[in-house]
């Protein structure tokens, strides 16, 4: 899933 920005977060993949 995409959260926040892209790789800006640990779960933003």
From Swiss-Prot:
Family classification: Belongs to the non-disulfide-bridged peptide (NDBP) superfamily. Short antimicrobial peptide (group 4) family.
Function as written in the Swiss-Prot or TrEMBL entry: May be an antibacterial peptide.
Keyword Secreted listed: yes
Secreted listed as a keyword: yes
Record GO cellular component, one term: extracellular region
Localisation: Secreted
The species this protein was found in: Tityus serrulatus (Brazilian scorpion)
Modified residues (Phenylalanine amide): 11
Key words of the record: Amidation, Antibiotic, Antimicrobial, Secreted
Tissue: Expressed by the venom gland.
Predominant cellular place of this UniProt entry's protein: secreted
Positions of disulphide bridges: none
Annotated GO biological process: defense response to bacterium
Name listed for the protein in its UniProt record: Venom peptide 1
